């Protein structure tokens, strides 16, 4: 069995395959180095331990002992405590004052709200002469509407409900006899026909060109040219009606 080179099937970084001893894929060795949180945390711890060592050495030295004695003589610790206590008490006093001011503002009566004066109506000098009429002199207008009679009243009186037609009119029983208006005139009178008056007759003399055209007969169609599409279209559609404008004086 022949040896198969599987390196040709592996992914490549340029001309170098990703297999063999080069197995550092995804580490800081690729792409010029990556950011490592572990190295950052270890560096911070080393820096803190270094500062602690230097501080302990300085505190335990002779200079540190002299500094501690001097602070004890000046009662530095008591001053720090007193300063912190005074600061805390000042903050508490300010808070108490703010709360007390809010309580007093709520307990004190509110000042009365000044209402604006009512607006004065200004009367124009033109309207001063007009006075409102007194109630005893007021006139009451009563309008009467003529409504049509009810159905029972119309039947009792025997009045027609529609305008009667002359050939179909019949007698109506009742107290009052109906009178029909707007009837056509009787057909006995014959109207004489009105003859129209004499009117002026205008006689026009035909021109010589029209006489020649009438004598020559109908116009013959133009010969159709074989190679011209306009002449073919004129032979199919025609040239239309030839109009002739003439001015005549009467």
UniProtKB/Swiss-Prot annotation:
Q: Where is this region: Disordered?
A: 103-147, 206-226
Positions of the propeptide segment:
1-33
Q: Where is this region: Amphipathic alpha-helix essential for membrane lytic activity?
A: 34-54
Q: Name one GO biological process term.
A: viral release from host cell
Q: Which UniProt keywords apply?
A: Capsid protein, Cytoplasmic inwards viral transport, Disulfide bond, Host cytoplasm, Host nucleus, Host-virus interaction, Late protein, Microtubular inwards viral transport, Phosphoprotein, Ubl conjugation, Viral capsid assembly, Viral penetration into host cytoplasm, Viral penetration via lysis of host organellar membrane, Viral release from host cell, Virion, Virus entry into host cell
- Identify residues that carry Phosphoserine: 124
Q: What are its GO cellular component terms?
A: host cell; host cell cytoplasm; host cell nucleus; viral capsid; viral procapsid
Renumbered residue ranges of the record's region Involved in endosomal membrane lysis? 36-53
Motif Nuclear localization signal: where in chain? 131-135, 245-248
For the site labelled Cleavage, the residues are 33-34, 239-240
What positions does the record give for the motif labelled PPXY motif?
148-151
Q: What is known of its domains?
A: N-terminal amphipathic alpha-helix domain is essential for the membrane lytic activity. Late-budding domains (L domains) are short sequence motifs essential for viral particle release. They can occur individually or in close proximity within structural proteins. They interacts with sorting cellular proteins of the multivesicular body (MVB) pathway. Most of these proteins are class E vacuolar protein sorting factors belonging to ESCRT-I, ESCRT-II or ESCRT-III complexes. Minor capsid protein 6 contains one L domain: a PPXY motif which binds to the WW domains of HECT (homologous to E6-AP C-terminus) E3 ubiquitin ligases, like NEDD4.
Q: What is this protein called?
A: Pre-protein VI
* Protein's organism: Human adenovirus C serotype 2 (HAdV-2)
């Amino acid at each position: 069995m022949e040896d198969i080179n599987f390196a040709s099937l592996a992914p490549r970084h340029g001309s170098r395959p990703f297999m063999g001893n080069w197995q550092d894929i995804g580490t800081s060795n690729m792409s010029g180095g990556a950011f490592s949180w572990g190295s950052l945390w270890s560096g911070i711890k080393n820096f803190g331990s270094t500062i602690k060592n230097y501080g302990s050495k300085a505190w335990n030295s002779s200079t540190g002992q002299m500094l501690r004695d001097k602070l004890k003589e000046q009662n530095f610790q008591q001053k720090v405590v007193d300063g912190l206590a005074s600061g805390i008490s000042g903050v508490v006093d300010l808070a108490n004052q703010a709360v007390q001011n809010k309580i007093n503002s709520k307990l004190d009566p509110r000042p009365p709200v000044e209402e604006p004066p009512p607006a004065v109506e200004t009367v124009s000098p033109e309207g001063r002469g007009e006075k409102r009429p007194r109630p005893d002199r007021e006139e009451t207008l009563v309008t009467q509407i003529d409504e049509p009679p009810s159905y029972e009243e119309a039947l009792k009186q025997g009045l027609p409900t529609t305008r009667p037609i002359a050939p179909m009119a019949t007698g109506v029983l009742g107290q009052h006899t109906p009178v029909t208006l707007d009837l056509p005139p009787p057909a006995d009178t014959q109207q004489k026909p009105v003859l129209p008056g004499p009117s002026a007759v205008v006689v026009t003399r035909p021109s010589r060109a029209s006489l020649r055209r009438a004598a020559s007969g109908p116009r013959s169609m133009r010969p159709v040219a074989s190679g011209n599409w306009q002449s073919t279209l004129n032979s199919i559609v025609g040239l239309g009606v030839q109009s002739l404008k003439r001015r005549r004086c009467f």
